[in-house]
Each structure stands twice: as C-alpha cells, then as structure tokens.
Amino acid sequence: MSMAEMRCPFSGHGAATTPASATTNQHWWPEQINLGLLHQHNPAANPLGSNFDYRQAFNSLDLNAVKADLMALMTDSQSWWPADWGHYGGLFIRMAWHSAGTYRLADGRGGAGHGNQRFAPLNSWPDNTNLDKARRLLWPIKAKYGSNLSWADLIILAGNCALESMGLPTAGFAGGREDIWEPEDDIYWGSETSWLSDERHDNDGAIESPLAATEMGLIYVNPEGPHGEPDPVASGREVRDTFARMGMNNEETVALVAGGHTFGKAHGAAPSAHLGADPEGAALEQLGLGWQNTYASGCGADTITSGIEGAWKPNPTRWDQGYFEMLFGYEWELHQSPAGAWQWHPKDVKAEHMIPDAHVPGRSAPPMMTTADLSLRFDPVYEPIARRFLGDPQAFGNAFAQAWFKLTHRDLGPRSCYLGADVPEAVMSWQDPLPTTSHPTIDAPAVDALKQELLNTGLSHGELISTAWASAASFRQSDRRGGANGARLRLQPQCNWELNNPEQLKRVLSVLEAVQMRFNQQHQGGMQVSLADLIVLSGSAAVEQAMAATGQRCRVRFTPGRVDASAEQTDNASFNALKPIADGFRNYLRSDLPLKAEQLLVDRAQQLHLSAPEMTALIGGFRVLGLNWDGSDIGVFTSRPGQFSNDFFVNLLDMSTQWSPVEGHSNLYQGIDTETKQPRWRASRVDLVFGSHAQLRAIAEVYGQAGGSARLAADFSAAWSKVMELDRFDLL
C-alpha cells in the first residue's frame, strides 16, 4: 500500500473523496431546506449525559462562595494577560454584555442563555476580540465548581460581580442557563461573507429582519460611526434602531451605553495588522486562543482590540458620574487612535481629568469618546435623558442596574426558570409575568366532564383545535416566550392577528369563557379552571374525537395548571414581536417575504422544538382535519375532511396525480388526475415539500404505507401534547 493510500481519511489531505474535503450537498443544492436545524444539540453530544439535571446541580451551589471567588479574581492580575489598572472588571463586563447583547427581539435568538460565546462564530467575531482571554481567566473558577455552574451562568455572574466590585449595586442575578455543546446553526447572523461588512441595509437604510447589529461581526453598531464615518447624529439613529431591535427603549439605551463605558478602556495600541488569526482559525498549539498580538509585549499597554484607544473617564474602576461629566463638560474634537480608528478627545483637558495609564507608571492620557458615545449628547432624543442622568446619580444608577438585569436575563424565560438566592422579588413586564393562584386545579373527573361539555358546545373540531394551536404555537424556544399559559390569545395584540382569524377566535373564546364561568361558579371555594387550560383541553378533546371517528383510539396527554394573565401583565409592543410572518402548519404565508414557505416552516418548527418526524406528523394531521387559517382546501388531500386519517400522505404519494404551479401564484399548485385530466387537489409549497424533499418524503412514506394510519395517530398525539406544554416550565 502506498503512502497516499495510507493517509487518514479525516485529515483533509490525500484522496479527493475524504470526508473533510468533500463537497457538501448544500453546495450542490443550496435551495434545499436544512432539516439539520431541527436536530441540533443531540443528547449524544452532551458529555454530562441525558440524565443530568442542571436545575438541581445549580441549586446545590454555594452561590456566595462562587461570588467571593469572582470578587477575588477581579484584582488577581495575571502576567499572561495583565488587568487594566489591576482590575479585570471592565473586561468581564464587556464579556457578559457581549454574551447577552446578541439577543434580538424579532426572533428571540441570540443572547446569553446557552453559553454560545464559546463557539463559532461568536467566539471569533471581531467585536469579541480578546474575550477568549476573559473566559480563560474564569477557567479556574469554572473548573472548581464543575457542572454545578454552567459557562452561560458564570459569564453573566462574572459581569455582575465586576459591577458590584466597582461600586454599583446590581438588581440581582438568576441562574438557570444551560450550556450547549456545539454551535447554534439556526441563528441567521446575516448574508455577508466578510467581517465588518454590511449588506443588511435596504435602500431606505432599514436593517434586514431579524438582524439587529449594523455590520457582520458587531454586537451593536460601529463605534466609529455608520460605516466608519464619525457623525454623532447619524450614529444616534443607528444606536436607537439597533437597541430597539434588541428590546431596549431610549432610557435603557442611554443608561446601558453610559453605564457600560463608566468602566475600563478600549484598546488600540497599534494597527490590527499585528493581530493573528481569531480563535477558530488559530494554530493548533494556541489551544483555542486567538488574536495573537505581535506588537511589542502583545498585552497590557500594547493590547489591540477594537482599535479605539483610551478610557472614557478618570477612575475607570469605580462607579460614578464621570462619564456624563466628561461628555457634557468638554467640547470634543476628532482624532485618530494609534491603530487609525476615529475617536474624539476633549479640548483643553484639565490636569485633574488626565487618566493614568492602565499599565505604565507616570504616563497619562486624556479621556476619549467614540462617535457612538457622542450620540448621547447630540441626538435630540438621547440628550435630555443623558442630562437628566447627569443631574440625578441615583436615577442613573437605578436605570443602569435595571437595564443590565433586563439585558442579561431577557432570554432566560419566565420567572419560573430563574434559579438561586439572588433572584429579585420585583416583577417586570418584559418577563411576561403570570399570576399566582391558591385554588386547586381541576382533577381527572373534572377533566373528563369538561371534555364532554366542550365537545357539546356546537363548536367544530376544527374551531377547537385551531384555537388551541393558535394559543400554544405562539411559543418560541429561542427566548422561551409565548405559549398557551396565560391565555394571552384572548388579549391584544394576539386576538387581532390575521393568522388567528379574529372573528372566529372571538366567537370560540366567548363559548369557552361561558364554560369556564359555569364551572367556576359551580365549584366556588374549590377547584377552578382557567381559560388557558380550557383552550388546550378543548383542542385535545377535539383531536381525540376526530381520531375516534376513524377508529383511532388515542388519549391525548393533558396536564392542568395553566393560569390566565391580565392585560396589565402583557406588554403589547413586546408581544407583537411574536406575531408570525408564516405558519406552514396552518398554510399561512405573508406575500411579501423573501424566503420560501418551506424554509419558514422549518424555522417555525425549530422554534417549536419539533423534530422532522414530529413536524411531518402534525402537517399531515392538520391537513386532513381542515385546519388552514382561512378555511381553504389547499393541502386538504382527503374526501373526509375533519376526520383523522393518513389520507394526506396516501394522496401526496399517489403517482396518478400530476402537479404544476398555478400561474400568477408563487405558493399555489394544482394537481390533476393523469388519466382524466380533471383537477384533484390544490397544494402549497409546504404541502408539496413532503413529497419533493428526499428526507421528508422518506418520513411521509412511513405514514403513507400499510400501518401508517395508526403510527400517524400516535405520533400526532405525542407531538400535539408536546407543543401544548412547551411553556409549562412549572412542570420542570
């Protein structure tokens, strides 16, 4: 055997057929949907095992001991990465901020909830330069507490401790963030193919949804100004848009920018040409550390990060009003840093405002501001807020503490997901709060009695099932928002979403509310039923009866205990971000979307934590039950709509039907009988993808073959119950 034949097949060298160098299917067929998005984070990839309970592990921690270790680390400067002014606080605040700051409101993705800063692409984003060192500084603490403390929680807790160590009382801390063990492939970070490039703005300057940052590889905006142009007013417009896309209002934005820049410094000792590859591209022997710096010592006073150089205020390791005092106390002139980045220096700086160098005794420098910082002074909306904070230190401190808590906890989910002794008692509207109840929930006999009453209301199976789905399927796993608990389907804005068929919804809910009122009046002082439970129970009962009509006997799991939220507990603007632009399960698609319907179906299924078989089973069941949002016959491949069967798959796979697109409709197809040439069915792209896509067709064949009907009923029932309980964090 030759040496070439003996080469390792995973090395990327040698034969053209080695796996590491092979051209992928996605290269050949880039338009094909990626079902891998539905099967991320396989339990087999988790070294802790499927039985590991992080909630239990975290609750066993001595949280005060962890915080004491973090406090000690703040001033334990290491020679391999020395702390600025002997304090790592600024570095850890940036690390925590950049972990949480990837969150965007539009789809709930990003954020601090999974420790994804450890993996590509975030670990190698230009805006995260040198945060690999921050995580390595934390490693001894992570190693000490092991699996009882996730990286995701440790990163945020380190930021909290950094703030407290420098004099800011925080609003609290909640644990509960479970680590992932591989990159998240479902997050769309943009279409750009080079760092710090911008192809996400349209001709009117709007950022492509769901993105929030202005350039590829940035957390927020370019600190030098839009596209590197040092224009504070234009920067203010970008800052406002970006922070709003991350769920922050104007006051929260000013507080966060000013509060974050109260500490630490920016680093731009020399041009970025001195930096080596990022962590993902670094040499093997660097063990995951990137941005090796060839300038002078490569660290300390010679550090290169953003290219901007300097601190914002005197005393960069203490919480005070210095940021605003500098911002409004001077006129500012444009300069370039040693790295060539645009930044601003004060005119005629006073001697007492010169800032001692972070590492070199006897050397000092004036304060600096970025273009984005100056937007707080020159933007007409931000300026009065900033001046108010300048004159009211307590208001500034409180606003920053609350905004920081929101920033770092936004994607953790409802308060029932919060762990630890430092969880604040205060309830915030952005947490989508739910009321507490003291009455007992309905028991099994009551459930059975209510089922019969609900089925006898005169409402159709389709009306009951579609209402339950509309309630539960608002859930998104990205930030654990939405879902059936709270019955917010009856409140603004959800009750008026086009997808939810408002007129039908109003009629169905009025009937269910009457059932609820009768039951609760009959059981005063005892068990009570919430509308949230009734919505789910009615849909589940209708599913069971539709299955029974075709001989399928399935018991749909139902667990009571949901509560009803009030309008006062519901932030309309925030909840409107959950409004679906497409729902393939109900054959709903807005006409102005650039993505194909089948791509949006996979995205929706991923947010509902569904596998490809679960998604397939639900689609097949929904079609024969006639659950299209508008009542159309599109995809209803059955002669007995409303009865549960595997007809959708049987007829989809029938070779005697020939399909062709309907002229003038991008999402509509006509199926004709190949013999008679008569129309048979109409279908959407979502319907036909289950016969077109090889993997989905393979699953569809299982449901369309002999024995498929019983399997479909069981799988549909399980998937339905799963979706109905996605937001039941109280059951954890």
Swiss-Prot record:
Its cofactor is heme b. Heme b binds at H261. It comes from the Bacteria. Formation of the three residue Trp-Tyr-Met cross-link is important for the catalase, but not the peroxidase activity of the enzyme. Its EC number is 1.11.1.21. It is an enzyme of class 1 (oxidoreductase). It catalyses: H2O2 + AH2 = A + 2 H2O; 2 H2O2 = O2 + 2 H2O. One of its GO terms (molecular function) is metal ion binding. Residues 1-22 form the signal peptide. One of its GO terms (cellular component) is cytosol. Residues 1-21 are annotated as: Disordered. The record marks R94 as: Transition state stabilizer. The active site is at H98. There is a cross-link at Y220-M246 (Tryptophyl-tyrosyl-methioninium (Tyr-Met) (with W-97)). There is a cross-link at W97-Y220 (Tryptophyl-tyrosyl-methioninium (Trp-Tyr) (with M-246)). Keywords: Heme, Hydrogen peroxide, Iron, Metal-binding, Oxidoreductase, Peroxidase, Signal. GO terms for biological process: cellular response to hydrogen peroxide; hydrogen peroxide catabolic process. Belongs to the peroxidase family. Peroxidase/catalase subfamily. Bifunctional enzyme with both catalase and broad-spectrum peroxidase activity. This is Catalase-peroxidase. It comes from Synechococcus sp. (strain RCC307).
